[in-house]
Amino acid sequence: MFTFLVKRLFQALIVMFVISLVAFAIQDNLGDPLRELVGQSVSEAERQALRDELGLNDPFITKYTRFVGAALQGDLGTSYFFKRPAVDVILDKLVATLELVFGASFIIVCLSIPLGVYSAIHPKSFFTKLVMAGSSIGISIPVFLTAIMLMYVFSIELGWLPSYGRGETANWLGWESGFFTLDGLAHLVLPSIALASIMLPLFIRLVRSEMLEVLSSEYIKFGKAKGLALNKIYYQHALKNTMLPVLTVGGVQIGTMVAYTILTETVFQWPGTGFLFLEAINRVDTPLITAYVIFVGLIFVVTNTIVDLLYGIINPTVNITGKGA
């Protein structure tokens, strides 16, 4: 276990180094950040003086070394627009994004498992064919188009749900969230469905394929021959083994969904980190852009490590000790 953790920590450091290098390298290709700091009336000489003061004219290696030194102390720079530490700005918006990810994850879990299991148990039924056709269509539709269609149907035409914003929030034990109000939950529905549409078809197919593989195994056939109840075979034995790879993929996709929130949050004007990232690009707020990329990369690294560790604990056949079996 210790060897595994050390190995994963070393891999995580390498990945974060590469991510930070790429994130920092793209800063020079995003435009001039001074456009948000000074007005049009400022002379070129004053602009150059400000660039020197901010260190924008320094060589790349000098700027990157300075950035890494500050990052190791938890400082990823100060946002040009908000005039606050970039990490604080991201953390302020993170709660809204996590609400969206939780809502989408809830929908995915509640739909993919029963639909995938049913499709595996009844592979030739009409409903299974309908589910598979729907998942094929769902994979091919981009998330922004799904979001626009949902908004048009349920907000504009039917008027059932709000079309944009986070809605009313309430504070509970220091946690400011829309989960605690009906208005906040109503605002969460459409963005959550749109975000879930990215992963839901994939998870339905994943659960179905894993369940089919388990159902074709020898111990399932032996259980049927022994006369065990089919429900016990399907839901007590087969489903448990089906969930192992689903857990692995699902954990990794949590980090993916945080990154995928950019388009969903933009369409619904959801005040999360994805919407913040696009605004930072438009404003050429390079410290905030770099901090966001590194933050999302960190989420990927942490979730992958946790999933690998949990999978090794749940499935004893997986070797995480670094020793031979």
Regions found by a protein language model. Give the residues of each.
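Residue-level signal for discrete positions within transmembrane alpha-helices
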Residues: A12, K93, T97, A133-S136, ...
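Hydrophobic alpha-helical transmembrane segments of membrane transport/permease proteins
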Residues: V15-T65, F154-F180
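An internal, D/E-rich "acidic patch" concept
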Residues: N57-I113
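Alpha-helical transmembrane segments of integral membrane proteins
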Residues: F2-T3, L94-F127, V143, W175-A325
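Membrane-water interface segments at transmembrane-helix boundaries in multipass membrane proteins
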Residues: A133-I141, L145-L200
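N-terminal signal-anchor/signal peptide hydrophobic helix marking the start
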Residues: V6-M16
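Hydrophobic alpha-helical segments of integral membrane proteins
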Residues: L9, E46, L50, F60-L76, ...
